[in-house]
Amino acid sequence: MANQPQQPDTELHNASHLMQYHDLIESIVAALDARDAYTASHSDRVADMVLVLAAALGLDEDETTRIHMAAHLHDIGKIAVPDSVLRKAGPLTRPEWEEMRRHPVTGYEILRKVDDFKEIAILVRHHHERWDGRGYPDGLSGHDIPPGSRVIAVADSIDAMMSSCLLYTSDAADEL
């Protein structure tokens, strides 16, 4: 019998693969967090909320993992937004707002190049779509919005509302 190369245990290989992705995601999120005070920890909070929402919705483990990974990366496209826009304290001008609105497409373009991230890239692209079609970047509405993107949008909105409350008063958490 000829010596055949041993195949790695598939389950162990997949777990190792997932850990490598997790480490990569953590590195990317840390790079983004370093650029913007608001973004710091935002992606982690959104990803944590996604786990709660996914459990409440009864989503399976694979779908939950995919949405959780996308939630960590949902603002990765902001890496291409100029600091003058990303860190601006006051209201954005129309051109600045248009620049900011490109981040979901930029995130999609970054992530879609990795075969195992193609589905995650789609969730990232559509996390600012709105049920009524007034979202961006593609103006999708209703059931045309991927369910995972809808879950991320809810978690993202909750975190944005809670964060803006906390900017105004330290008692905001007690009020919520």
Model features per residue range: what roles?
Residues 12-13, 19-170:
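Metal-dependent catalytic cores of enzymes that make or break cyclic nucleotides
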